[in-house]
């Protein structure tokens, strides 16, 4: 399911947070419609601003809108004229007082939405899709925060008659791991052959507080192994006594046979005694 489901919704409450924070009972439908219109207005009116995401928070008589952008100067405008214009539109749309916050994205090369938007702009400019994908991946992996990236494009790539999907990946992108902090971005490139969808996944390590990752977890202390002479010797159950007995019996039999060989020819030796001595196991005493 990690390959199918939206990475942001899949990890809500675990490693990601809601982009709209408010509570409503009867006005739930109206608020959802307003949020969609606000984000659509930002995406269509400020294409060159490089907007990563828009967070919306509502209270009883105020709406707070946080715009995360890579180019805050375009959103603010000259002497704040553009910001005032956007605030006026939002107040007219919501009918409430709007608090507009413009937040700059420090590293746009490692932001999934901005990377997808950059690849889509290059595809619209007729740049080779492979070159655009590899360039975006190389610039993203230069950031030490980025642990892995995957870029996927789908559509009539290179003006082909049949649409297809291609992707490139570098590093680790664990889509099934819930504690993984994965950013996801999607953007559509408009070309003369049709639209090409661009999807970007960026893995930035684990983001669950109070939980140690395998790399950060302290290693378990290893028990020092003593010298072999210091360790107690463990005998095999039922085998040590038998082995010792068999050895002593063999020695006794060899001694008896040697004595028989040294006996003078006139004296007779009991063959049965020799055989019984050879076969009878010697008694072994075990020290307590």
Swiss-Prot record:
Domain KH type-2: 38-106
Coiled-coil residue windows: none
One GO BP annotation of this record: translation
Keywords tagged on the record: Ribonucleoprotein, Ribosomal protein, RNA-binding, rRNA-binding
SUPFAM superfamilies, per database record: Prokaryotic type KH domain (KH-domain type II), Ribosomal protein S3 C-terminal domain
GO cellular component: cytosolic small ribosomal subunit
Keyword Cytoplasm: no
Composition skew (Basic and acidic residues), residue ranges: 219-232
Region (Disordered): 209-288
CDD domains assigned: KH-II_30S_S3
GO molecular function terms listed in the Swiss-Prot or TrEMBL record: mRNA binding; rRNA binding; structural constituent of ribosome
Segments of skewed composition (Polar residues): 277-288
Record's compositionally biased regions (Low complexity): 249-264
Subunit structure: Part of the 30S ribosomal subunit. Forms a tight complex with proteins S10 and S14.
Primary role: Binds the lower part of the 30S subunit head. Binds mRNA in the 70S ribosome, positioning it for translation.
Family: Belongs to the universal ribosomal protein uS3 family.
Designated name of the protein: Small ribosomal subunit protein uS3
Originating organism: Salinispora tropica (strain ATCC BAA-916 / DSM 44818 / JCM 13857 / NBRC 105044 / CNB-440)
Organismal lineage: Bacteria, Bacillati, Actinomycetota, Actinomycetes, Micromonosporales
